[in-house]
């Protein structure tokens, strides 16, 4: 009997999300489940199946992504509400989001050889790839008969021109150590591009956008005729915009003035995962959390901020976003279908969108205040919030991005189901 579902896995630093999809030409959601709060216990478990929803604080100790994934599998395959729709026997494929794919330009089916190739990339992105690969390893052990496919955030940016992706350092060293701009959030940008092109009734290859994925990790991408021509993240996701705990772009020598132990291993390192003190400071002890004491941007993006530091954090993010929009607008020669806001903050923060668009009005962008405030409905993938009544205005969109769906959708394409 043919297998009939796809499992998409998205492992972050503090949460693991999984979604079961139908294995059909256009996948549809069967069930979703998530463990969050891994780094800030107690962890919580929640799921939804159709109209049924459940959320609970976990009594079990969950200290890692693999712990969370094991619990998710156990619950999904044993819970009375889930076991009838989330069966291991029905799984055709497991799709894994892996942040750094190095030189891989397309999804990779996991076998011994490809797994070890991905392990070699952990030195480039230990904070980002380690958890995902631990779950890939767990799937091979717990679900050995189900094929795992990895999808890379970096693959979307394979079209970056050499003058964009090359760092002006010794090129022999750069080639040997794979030191170049890669770019990330590519699975999200793929979804955004396809969804906005469909909304505009345009071919993807004729769609040009300035896309913003703004969440606890944030980036901007210039898309010309369906291809990434520049993006704010670089060798790792640390480059570019600040995030909840990331510094974003800084003077490269700053960290050596910050501490004289920058090159030493951080106490957060483990036997399997090596993190330098510099990496920990800039990835985990920076961003708007160190300015405000919170990673929750909804407490920062308010009309009456509780402190000057909250206002400063908001202004810093807006300033950096606006800088990239100006840069990319010029690179695209002004030929863009619009600016697209996506990601948890981009989709939810009307104040951020308002501030960014007000500061780019010289480029012709403007939003309708009511549409911007209302934002997208639950079932709306793309909404146009452009100011109405003006023919000269450039368009502004919100896209509710969905990386898990994008992996499932591309899984059906890579496995040829879309041609059946």
UniProtKB/Swiss-Prot annotation:
Domain of life from the UniProt record: Eukaryota
Residues reported to bind Mg(2+): 10, 403
Enzyme class: transferase
Binding site residues for ATP: 17, 213-217
Site (Transition state stabilizer): 185, 246
Catalytic activity: acetate + ATP = acetyl phosphate + ADP
Needed cofactors: Mg(2+)
Annotated catalytic residues: 153 (proton donor/acceptor)
Pathway in which the depicted protein is active: Metabolic intermediate biosynthesis; acetyl-CoA biosynthesis; acetyl-CoA from acetate: step 1/2
GO MF, any single term: acetate kinase activity
BP terms from Gene Ontology: acetate metabolic process; acetyl-CoA biosynthetic process
Keyword Metal-binding: yes
Keywords on record: ATP-binding, Kinase, Magnesium, Metal-binding, Nucleotide-binding, Transferase
UniProt xrefs under InterPro entries: Ac/propionate_kinase, Aliphatic_acid_kin_short-chain, Aliphatic_acid_kinase_CS, ATPase_NBD
Enzyme Commission number, as recorded: 2.7.2.1
Sites where the protein binds substrate: 97
Pfam family, one: Acetate_kinase
Similarity comment text for this entry: Belongs to the acetokinase family.
Protein name: Probable acetate kinase
Species name: Emericella nidulans (strain FGSC A4 / ATCC 38163 / CBS 112.46 / NRRL 194 / M139)
